[in-house]
Amino acid sequence: TLKPPGRVSTGNGADDDEEVEDLSGLPEIPIGGPGVYPIHAASGVGYGLGLAGNAHRHAPDGWLPSVKYFVEELGEDVNARDYNGYAPLHNAAARGDVELINYLVEMGADVTVLTRKGETTADMANGPVQRVTVFPAVVQLLESLGSKINHNCVSC
C-alpha cells in the first residue's frame, strides 16, 4: 500500500458539516449549471467516488472507444472538468485504466490537475474512498508523468 505509517482513516476526509477548501482554482458552478459532460461518463465518472464501486470498472473494450469517439469525432476537451473538478484522467486513474490514461495523456490531458477537494490523478489510483481498489502500478505511472500523490489512501 502507499499509506504512510500512522495515518488515520477518516472516511471521506471531512465531516459532513465541515466546509472543504476548493483547491482546484475552478470557478464556482452556478445553480443549474453543468454537472458532468459526456466525456466524463465515457471515462467512468463516479467510480473514484465509490458511487459505482466495481460495478462498471469492467466494461470490456468499452471505455477507450467511447472516449476516442468523444475526443476525435466530437472534439470534446480531454481536460474538461465536472462539477467536482474531476477530469476524465481522474476517472481513468480511479479504475486503473492504463490504456485510457495513456490515450488521454497522448491527447494532451494534464496529469497535474486537482479536484475541488485537492485530489490528484495519482490520488485517484490510490484508493480515494473505501472499497475502491488501489492500483500501485498506475500510481507509479502517473507520478512518472508528473502527478503528485497526497498519500490519502482510504482503502489501504
What do the predicted segments below correspond to?
Residues 79-85:
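Generic long, charged, amphipathic alpha-helical segments
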Residues 1-5, 65-77, 102-110, 140-148:
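Ankyrin repeat domain, specifically the short helix-to-loop turn at the C-terminus of the second helix
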Residues 111-154:
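Leucine-rich solenoid repeat scaffolds
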Residues 7-9, 45-49, 77, 99, ...:
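Alpha-solenoid repeat scaffolds
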Residues 3-49, 128:
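Acidic/polar low-complexity surface segments
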